[in-house]
Amino acid sequence: SAGKYRLTGLLRGRRGTEQHIGTHTAGERFVLLTLAGTIRPNAGAAEIGVERNYKAVSVGTSLSQASARTFTNTGSGLKPLSPVHLSGGRQPNNDWIIGWTRRGRIDTAWRDSVDVPVGETTESYEVDIMSGTTVKRTITSVTPEITYTSAQQVTDFGANQTTITVNVYQKSATVGRGFAAARAY
């Protein structure tokens, strides 16, 4: 019927939005955007925490008819994307080696099996070793791999662990931690 649309074939979780995949419901309002006529606000680090009102105006609608939505810039567009392809395992000496592949939010073109360029000032990561929702240890790294040693496990848990859960973050000099990649081993 008039004014109703059925959306199908949508690609979700693109360009670092996977954390929002499950946040929409049937019957929810949406704005259909096309590249032509779309203006993206240029909000840099100085705009983080600033609240502004925005209106979405379509063909046949005037600015005065559109409802304003308040938005506070959280800097999420500046956060590094979550790493992907987390891998690893427990070694014979009880150390855990965990590795991953970084993603880029800037200059993301695939170049014949070569990693995307680091889109941050420096390549830096933090890996949280978890116990439920409690962070037991944070390990920093400047490469996409860490070793969680047997000695660290004994300090953190009182014994070597047969399973672990990690949250991996790439870091930004501007906004700190990016989005987490979580995995249980």
Each PLM stretch: what is its role?
Residues 1-185:
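Interface-prone segments of viral and bacterial extracellular assemblies
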